[in-house]
Curated annotation (Swiss-Prot):
Binding sites annotated in the UniProt record for D-ribose 5-phosphate: D32, G161, G222, G243, S244
GO biological process: amino acid metabolic process; pyridoxal phosphate biosynthetic process; pyridoxine biosynthetic process
Organism, as annotated: Halobacterium salinarum (strain ATCC 700922 / JCM 11081 / NRC-1) (Halobacterium halobium)
Protein name: Pyridoxal 5'-phosphate synthase subunit PdxS
Superkingdom in the source lineage: Archaea
Alphabetical list of Pfam families matching this protein: SOR_SNZ
Annotated metabolic or biological route of this protein: Cofactor biosynthesis; pyridoxal 5'-phosphate biosynthesis
Length: 302
């Protein structure tokens, strides 16, 4: 059995170690939480980790303004409350927010488009940190650029806070389709693809040879029901992030437990039917097609 020291070493250190910690979350559900009470509920219903932020994405959309890193005291309080990993969000390009999150003990940092970007041109150099990072991607080029910067986990961007899974599906299909195309290319064609998509050529070749991303790939953005979670697992995701879909639901405990069960039984329709029954209404959603262009969080970062 791993000791507390062993787990700490798995969380922090070399690229291999950081990727290893991220891989430990594979097959699980990571839930957004804004306080200790929500974190405790998430742990009780089976989340493998929680993501702390000052407001869930749906509420960030409603209130507008600048969305920033949560109060570090919120994260430390949650760390004291639960035994599962606790993650925190920083703004894209905001190195100091990431340094603060690392300093207070975040197990992983999400350089997230859900928050207002601090830098429109550059992401954080994640290789310089000991804490692992997760980043969003809409396509394979974005995913490989984030991995080259040091991301230990990729997630679909989707369209957070909408309750509409459409864009998460689209992004996952984009990534899988591009990988299949790379697998059918020869060495020179892969080099050309890397140039055309501004992707690191070594990672392009590694991805083609593996037939998948070299890091774990989770689904995120608009996942609001057990069926949504099962769908993303069907499309080959390694796990699920759920934001507004849990605590925006009528019965967060029932919804959270159902999403976890759906991930574990995503290939069993009869079991999924049982899981999805009598859990209360899900969050109120907004179709992605109705979003004004300036409200599309997925377009932040490149």
């Amino acid at each position: 059995m791993a000791t507390e020291t062993d787990l700490e070493e798995l969380r922090r250190g070399s690229e291999l170690v950081k990727r290893g910690f991220a891989k430990m979350q594979k097959g699980g559900v990571i839930m957004d939480v804004v306080n200790r009470e929500q974190a405790r509920i998430a742990e009780d219903v089976g989340a493998v980790a929680v993501m702390n932020l000052e407001a869930v994405p749906a509420d960030i959309r409603k209130r507008g303004g600048v969305a920033r890193m949560a109060d570090p005291a919120s994260l430390t309080g949650i760390i004291e409350e639960v035994s599962i990993p606790v993650m925190g969000k920083s703004r894209i390009g905001h190195r100091k927010e990431a340094e603060i999150l690392q300093a207070v003990g975040a197990d992983m940092i999400d350089e997230s488009e859900v928050l207002t970007p601090a830098d429109d041109e550059y992401h954080i150099d994640k290789r310089e940190f000991t804490a692992p990072f997760v980043c969003g991607a809409r396509n394979l080029g974005e995913a490989l650029r984030r991995i080259d910067e040091g991301a230990a986990m990729i997630r679909t961007k989707g369209e957070a806070g909408t309750g509409d899974v459409n864009q998460a599906v689209h992004h996952q299909r984009n990534i899988k389709s591009a990988i299949r195309k790379l697998e059918g290319m020869d060495y020179e064609e892969r080099d050309m693809w890397a140039r055309d998509h501004e992707a690191p050529r070594e990672l392009v070749h590694e991805t083609a040879e593996m037939g998948r991303l070299p890091v774990v790939n989770f689904a995120a953005g608009g996942i609001a029901t057990p069926a949504d979670a099962a769908l993303m697992m069907h499309h080959g995701c390694d796990g699920i992030f759920v934001g507004s879909g849990i605590f925006g639901a009528e019965n967060p405990e029932a919804m959270g437990r159902a999403v976890v069960d759906a991930v574990n039984n995503h290939d069993d329709p009869e079991r999924l039917a049982e899981i999805a029954s009598n859990i209360g209404e899900g969050m109120q959603g907004d179709p992605n097609a109705d979003l004004p262009e300036d409200e599309r969080m997925q377009d932040r970062g490149n």
